[in-house]
């Protein structure tokens, strides 16, 4: 009766649950001895094949026996499929045992699934792994917990001792106390290549010396005082010179740029057109400016002047920062009004329009309305809009030249005379074009002359210092 229940359980595992049933798995699952599990599997296969000859069952066998190989006899244990059982039996000299190892529905390609099945069941029964086994040893007794803890401590101590020895050996080599390494003497190439190699070695030695001296100077400068700013460090690293000398030169360069900006401001204010100021005052202010510049240059004559490279860089920056802006061309209109004593009042110049990024073409000629005469035949005084250039400093401190329309008063007779003279000498379009070019060149030449004067004074100051 019990055997019948076991066979039904095996049939359920194989057919219904589609499991791989090994003799070890069956012994642990049903709690029977391994030899009994093997016998149960064999009985199940025999009964199943008698009942249904076409039953789909794949069986693996555990075969053991003696084998003569290379003139020596050896004991062989193998797990083979049913189709290879006869071939393995023929190779064995003496067959010791043949047992059913596993039963499954699917055909196995290798022994991996069999190993996984046994591994999982043994892992879940580690404490009683030899309970149902046929191999047993009575002398094998489990250790007490105290003995196991002491043995683990001894193992840890020995492991720590070994690790400390390895660390000591590593420290000897890393800290420089180890045996000196043999120097690899590289053979220098002969001839021209040898000359180049020796020159390269000398250059590397010189660069190492220079870097050491520069590092010493930087440390001395940092300990001496707090005069060196952050910008000085950046500039000294960039130009690759001594730290303290570059700090002084950078301070002088900043002060010189500030003074040049201060000098440029009055020049711009002089060039702004003011109708109320007379021409005599303008000339006197222009003469007074170089005197002020010379006085300021004398005051800072003791300082170190800028080098030629730095002056070129500042001039290039100034040239880049100059911009010429043209306003949008408005439709020009002439205003006609009768001659009166109050018509000679000077108008204030219109404020400069906002700077427009694209440069729009300047209109060459403006349409002039026909001359208007009164019924009495008198000439009328007219207001005419004329395109003039204006220079001023913007918010960034750049010199900006702008074309601005200004109104001028003229009579019909004066206008006719101007038209006649211009038609005799040159076409009217050329006069309108050349006026802004000449006026543009004026302020640029003035600023260039000022820059040259500043540079010459600074160079003379540099030679006086030396």
Curated annotation (Swiss-Prot):
UniProt crosslink position (Glycyl lysine isopeptide (Lys-Gly) (interchain with G-Cter in SUMO)): 258, 433
Main location: cytoplasm
Modification after translation, per record: Ubiquitinated, but not targeted to the proteasome. Sumoylated. Sumoylation with SUMO3 may be predominant.
Record-level GO cellular component terms: cytoplasm; delta DNA polymerase complex; nucleoplasm; zeta DNA polymerase complex
Positions of the UniProt region annotated as Disordered: 169-188, 199-232, 274-393, 406-466
Keywords for the protein's UniProt record, in alphabetical order: Acetylation, Cytoplasm, Disease variant, DNA damage, DNA excision, DNA repair, DNA replication, Isopeptide bond, Nucleus, Phosphoprotein, Ubl conjugation
Pfam families the UniProt entry points to: CDC27
Biased composition (Polar residues): 455-466
Top-level taxonomic group: Eukaryota
GO biological-process terms attached to the record: DNA biosynthetic process; DNA strand elongation involved in DNA replication; DNA synthesis involved in DNA repair; DNA synthesis involved in UV-damage excision repair; DNA-templated DNA replication; error-prone translesion synthesis; mismatch repair; nucleotide-excision repair, DNA gap filling
Consequence of substituting residue 258 to R: Partially loss of sumoylation. Complete loss of sumoylation
Modification type Phosphothreonine: residues: 277, 411
InterPro entries per UniProt: POLD3, POLD3_sf
One MF annotation (Gene Ontology) recorded for this entry: protein-macromolecule adaptor activity
Outcome (variant: residue 10 to T): In IMD122; uncertain significance; the mutant protein is not detected in patient cells
Record field: compositional bias (Pro residues): 349-361
Compartments where found: Cytoplasm; Nucleus
Crosslink feature (Glycyl lysine isopeptide (Lys-Gly) (interchain with G-Cter in SUMO2)) location: 258, 261, 433
Chain positions with Phosphoserine modification: 307, 407, 409, 413, 458
Motif range (PIP-box): 456-463
Entry-annotated residues carrying N-acetylalanine: 2
Domain notes: The PIP-box mediates the interaction with PCNA.
Quaternary structure and partners: Component of both the DNA polymerase delta and DNA polymerase zeta complexes. The tetrameric DNA polymerase delta complex (Pol-delta4), which consists of POLD1/p125, POLD2/p50, POLD3/p66/p68 and POLD4/p12, with POLD1 bearing DNA polymerase and 3' to 5' proofreading exonuclease activities. Within this complex, directly interacts with POLD2. Following stress caused by DNA damaging agents or by replication stress, POLD4 is degraded and Pol-delta4 is converted into a trimeric form of the complex (Pol-delta3), which consists of POLD1, POLD2 and POLD3.
Annotated disease: Immunodeficiency 122: An autosomal recessive, severe immunologic disorder characterized by recurrent viral and bacterial infections of the respiratory tract and skin, appearing in early infancy. Additional clinical features include poor overall growth, global developmental delay with poor motor skills, impaired intellectual development, and poor or absent speech acquisition. Some patients have diffuse skin rash, erythroderma, sensorineural hearing loss, lymphadenopathy, dysmorphic facial features, and tooth abnormalities. Death in early childhood may occur.
This protein's name: DNA polymerase delta subunit 3
Organism listed in the record: Homo sapiens (Human)
């Amino acid at each position: 009766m019990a055997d019948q229940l076991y066979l039904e359980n095996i049939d359920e595992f194989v057919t219904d649950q589609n499991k791989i049933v090994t003799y070890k798995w069956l012994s642990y699952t049903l709690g029977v001895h391994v030899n009994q599990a093997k016998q149960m599997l064999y009985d199940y296969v025999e009964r199943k094949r008698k009942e249904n000859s076409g039953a789909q069952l794949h069986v693996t066998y555990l075969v053991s026996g003696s084998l003569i190989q290379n003139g020596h006899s050896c004991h062989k244990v193998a797990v083979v499929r049913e189709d290879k059982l006869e071939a393995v039996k023929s190779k064995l000299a003496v067959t010791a045992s043949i047992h059913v190892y596993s039963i499954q529905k699917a055909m196995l390609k290798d022994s991996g699934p069999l190993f996984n099945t046994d591994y999982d069941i043994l892992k879940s029964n580690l404490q009683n792994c030899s309970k149902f086994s046929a191999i047993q040893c009575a002398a094998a007794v489990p250790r007490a917990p105290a003995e196991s803890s002491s043995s683990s401590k001894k193992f840890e101590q020995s492991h720590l001792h070994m690790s400390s020895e390895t660390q000591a050996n590593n420290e000897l080599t890393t800290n420089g106390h180890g045996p000196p390494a043999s120097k690899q003497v590289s053979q220098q190439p002969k001839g021209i290549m040898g000359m180049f190699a020796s020159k390269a070695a000398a250059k590397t030695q010189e660069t190492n010396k220079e870097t050491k001296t520069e590092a010493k100077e930087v440390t001395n400068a940092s300990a001496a005082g707090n005069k060196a700013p952050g910008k000085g460090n950046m500039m000294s690293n960039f130009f690759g010179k001594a730290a303290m000398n570059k700090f002084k030169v950078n301070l002088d360069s900043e002060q010189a740029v500030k003074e040049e900006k201060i000098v440029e401001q009055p020049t711009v204010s002089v060039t702004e057109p003011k109708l109320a100021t007379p021409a005599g005052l303008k000339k006197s202010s222009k003469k007074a400016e170089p005197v002020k510049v010379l006085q300021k240059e004398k005051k800072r004559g003791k300082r170190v002047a800028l080098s030629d490279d730095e002056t070129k860089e500042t001039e290039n920056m100034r040239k880049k920062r100059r911009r010429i802006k043209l306003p949008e061309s408005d439709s020009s209109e002439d205003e006609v009004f009768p001659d009166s004593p109050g018509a000679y009042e000077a108008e204030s110049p219109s404020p400069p329009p906002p700077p427009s990024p694209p440069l729009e073409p300047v209109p060459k000629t403006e349409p002039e309305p026909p001359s208007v005469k009164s019924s009495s035949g008198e000439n009328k005084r007219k207001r005419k809009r004329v395109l003039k250039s204006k220079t001023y400093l913007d918010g960034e401190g750049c010199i900006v030249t702008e074309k601005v329309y200004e109104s001028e008063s003229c009579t019909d007779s004066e206008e006719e005379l101007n038209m006649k003279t211009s038609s005799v000498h040159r076409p009217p379009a050329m006069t309108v074009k050349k006026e802004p070019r000449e006026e543009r060149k004026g302020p640029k030449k003035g600023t260039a002359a000022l820059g040259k004067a500043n540079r010459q004074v600074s160079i003379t100051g540099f030679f006086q210092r030396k």
